[in-house]
From Swiss-Prot:
Belongs to the asfivirus B66L family. One of its GO terms (cellular component) is membrane. Its main location: host cell. The lineage of its organism: Viruses, Varidnaviria, Bamfordvirae, Nucleocytoviricota, Pokkesviricetes. Residues 62-66 are cytoplasmic. This is Transmembrane protein B66L.
Length: 66
């Protein structure tokens, strides 16, 4: 993994674990957030979002779009 992918993965990790992401995205799913904290289901959703976003970014890097 080159430095570009590693940096983007770290930034995506910060975004997915941010309070804004939890409040606006994860909280839309039933039983994913309790008292503004992700439940186990919410943590799984964060992982799924991270994998999907990284896959998209990786594709864009491989196609020389990013």
């Amino acid at each position: 993994m080159d430095i570009k992918r590693a940096l983007i993965l770290f930034l995506l990790f910060l975004v997915v674990l941010s309070n804004a992401f939890v409040d606006y995205i994860i909280s839309n799913f039933n039983h994913a957030v309790t008292c503004r904290k992700p439940t186990y289901f919410g943590i799984v959703l964060q992982g799924i979002f991270l994998v999907i976003l990284f896959s998209i970014v990786d594709y864009l890097i491989n196609e020389n779009i990013l």
